[in-house]
Amino acid sequence: MDLYYRSTRSDDVRVTASQAILKGLADDGGLYVPESIPALDASFEELSGMDYRQVAYEVMKLFLTDFTEEELKACINKAYDSKFDTDEIAPLVKADGAYFLELFHGSTIAFKDMALSILPHLMITSARKNNIKNDIVILTATSGDTGKAALAGFADVEGTKIRVFYPKNGVSPIQEKQMVTQKGKNTYVVGIHGNFDDAQTGVKNMFGDKVLNEELNAGGYQFSSANSINIGRLVPQIVYYVYAYTRLLADGEISKDEKINIVVPTGNFGNILAAYFAMHMGVPVNKLICASNENKVLYDFFATGTYDRNREFVLTSSPSMDILISSNLERLIYMIAGDDAARNKELMDSLKTEGRYSITPQMREKLSDFYGNYASEKETADVIKAIYEDTGYVIDTHTAVAACVYKKYVSDTSDKTATVIASTASPFKFTRSVMDAIDKAKYDSMTDFELVDELSRIANVTVPQAIEDIRTAPVLHDTVCDKTQMKDVVKKILNIN
């Protein structure tokens, strides 16, 4: 059966999966959502005998119904190959009373690789299916990880150009070095004076700028997005939650139909929304635990039913979650409003004009699957140190936020359910913050790359290739602009007057 996609802001939009992937964002500013969430048609017994690529096909075929089996399998096989440093793709590691789902074994050592390894192939296939002759310009805002993963995915992909904007002072030194050393004749990286929300708003405004889009079209280009607003990012992320459940079953850690908790550190809400979709596909989930850092806008939303971005933006040691405008939450709002696009648009308009909105008591009742909490900077550092000292396992700052919130959840509920924690980045990506947490006095005087070697030694883990590659790599991108100049920069890069 064919599955179509609608906009969260209008009942008039109905497109195929490939059209939604190409567009990224609907013309009305809404996000694409499937008309329904399909149920898995393979049993967990069957899925437990499959490898990651096979599970990916079983999940993604249900959402991308206008792709042939051959097309989809080709995309999957090109994505999940030797770019990942383990055949498992997303291994589970048991530590500290939970199962850490390691999503950082791809080419840029962050969970964004899980979706951005396949998105370029989905996009090129979609363009072919829809007879698109224009070059596709990927426009992306990043809080650190998406940018590098998107650059790596799209570098030198025929028929595409990628433009990444990041907050100049809002990413880790390693994250910045990864981006500004990116090779590829179709890549361009720009730092902005502003925060991630400024970058994301600038990108969204360009998508919605009719005149700019007409100018692009005349120049033989069209925009698409590699951010998690693109359904082609969200669908591949569902896979690893289904896969994690099958691994727990296959390893005898849980029994048939036993429920699990899933903890996700999140700012833009895409990664936990994928877990919500997995639950609705049939993965037995007891609780979805939403972990925030000190930018706790999502925690406050779950606690009060009011989303309010009118607050101070905090720069934390988990920069990929330093977000006050959580784009993917809109998809959840639309769904708990009963697919009411008009109601959702009203709330999103309120967010744009007043910086806040409140949902109804009836909508709040539909959030009972979620538990939200947050971790302070001190709590985050304390958890990294405690888990390392107790187990020898080293986690990054974002994963530590999740581990801390999970401890708070257990303290609040005494729930003993088996729990998967999404481990979203390698500790090597945030080496200084991680080593400061373990022993600041000891490591404070070391350089970033000395810390990398020391982390490798104490964790007994080989330095990832992604880090080795940037030790001596030259800076290739040094453009910096004001947040108000983003459109001008894009036009200049593309030679559009």
Language model features with spans:
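PLP-dependent amino-acid enzyme catalytic core
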Residues: M1-N497
